[in-house]
Amino acid sequence: MSVLHVCMVTRNKSIAATSLHTAMNLHMLCMMRGMHLEIHFVEDKSSLPKLIKSGERMFWMDYGTNLNNEILGKVVDPFDKGVQALVFPSVKEGINWDQFTKKTKAGSKEPVGQRGLEFDTTVGKKLADGLYELDKTSARVWAMDGKPVDKKLRGGKDPIKLPLDSNEAMFTTLKNIGIKVGVASEAIVVCHYTHECFGNILEAAGVELAP
């Protein structure tokens, strides 16, 4: 029986409710396909090398992310066109106001709510409908087949250490060693960005706020 390893990044030992929904939907897909599902709650990528050595499919979800149900089949099914890792692009945090102004002045027909958004992934040539070759990414949601990656990392004279601190550096390394990385352009990734409220800090126990 094949195994799907789902890695979910936690904050303060918790995950977002929408991430949980994605995990539950993946569980149903695995049951339908006769796959074994293992969920790992992680704080970083320190456990990733061990999972790669298992040779099984991995699915990574950063904290506060989820993936639309229509695309979840790509997480569990064999990748198309020889792809060995699949990226699900998402919007970066914040708004690029310079980009928004430039597009607006140029008369862009793009929806107003999207003109200032930047994505974490750029693509190359089209491989198939909804599938593109990766150019560059810092994706927070992705899937990978462990067996070909492990073979490339350990196949040379000197084993290659995969950089884990940066998503961009990790995928750049994967491309450089010959891993074919695809981009699922039809994926909808919703990201929840957390911010510390300054007011909550000031109203902590023992702190008195003057009127």
Residue positions per predicted region:
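C-terminal catalytic/acceptor-binding lobe
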Residues: 2-5, 11-14, 131, 136-211
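Residue-level marker for beta-strand->alpha-helix junctions and adjacent short loops that shape enzyme
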Residues: 9-13, 65-66, 93
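Glycine-rich, basic loop-to-helix element that forms the pyrophosphate-binding segment
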Residues: 40-54, 70
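Short amphipathic alpha-helical segments and helix-helix/interface helices
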Residues: 48-49, 72-76, 168-172
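Short, high-confidence coil segments that cap the C-terminus of an alpha-helix
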Residues: 55-56, 83, 179
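Short beta-strand-to-loop acidic/aromatic patch adjacent to the donor-nucleotide binding site
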Residues: 55-68
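Conserved catalytic core of nucleotide-sugar-dependent glycosyltransferases
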Residues: 68-158
